[in-house]
Swiss-Prot record:
GO molecular function per UniProt: sodium channel inhibitor activity; toxin activity
Keyword presence, Secreted: yes
Keyword Disulfide bond annotated: no
Keywords on record: Ion channel impairing toxin, Neurotoxin, Secreted, Toxin, Voltage-gated sodium channel impairing toxin
Tissues showing expression: Expressed by the venom gland.
Source species: Centruroides tecomanus
Gene3D superfamilies xrefs: Knottin, scorpion toxin-like
Ranges in coiled-coil conformation: none
Residue ranges annotated for the LCN-type CS-alpha/beta domain, each copy included: 1-30
Main location: secreted
SUPFAM superfamilies: Scorpion toxin-like
Stated name of the protein: Neurotoxin II.22.5
GO cellular component assignments: extracellular region
Function, in words: Binds to sodium channels (Nav) and inhibits the inactivation of the activated channels, thereby blocking neuronal transmission.
Amino acid sequence: KEGYIVNYHTGCKYTCAKLGDNDYCLRECK
Protein backbone atom coordinates (compact mmCIF):
# COMPACT_ATOMS: atom_id res chain seq x y z
CA LYS A 1 0.00 0.00 0.00
CA GLU A 2 3.00 2.23 -0.37
CA GLY A 3 2.30 5.55 -2.05
CA TYR A 4 -1.40 5.47 -1.20
CA ILE A 5 -3.44 7.11 1.53
CA VAL A 6 -5.34 4.39 3.38
CA ASN A 7 -8.81 4.89 4.81
CA TYR A 8 -8.51 3.45 8.32
CA HIS A 9 -12.27 2.94 8.57
CA THR A 10 -12.35 0.51 5.64
CA GLY A 11 -8.67 -0.27 5.12
CA CYS A 12 -9.17 0.70 1.47
CA LYS A 13 -7.03 3.02 -0.59
CA TYR A 14 -8.68 6.43 -1.09
CA THR A 15 -7.65 6.33 -4.75
CA CYS A 16 -9.69 3.14 -5.18
CA ALA A 17 -12.76 4.85 -3.81
CA LYS A 18 -12.20 7.88 -6.04
CA LEU A 19 -11.85 5.69 -9.12
CA GLY A 20 -14.90 3.68 -8.10
CA ASP A 21 -13.00 0.40 -8.46
CA ASN A 22 -14.66 -1.12 -5.41
CA ASP A 23 -14.02 -4.77 -6.33
CA TYR A 24 -10.34 -4.10 -6.99
CA CYS A 25 -10.15 -2.02 -3.82
CA LEU A 26 -11.62 -4.81 -1.72
CA ARG A 27 -9.05 -7.26 -3.09
CA GLU A 28 -6.29 -4.77 -2.28
CA CYS A 29 -7.63 -4.39 1.26
CA LYS A 30 -7.56 -8.12 1.85
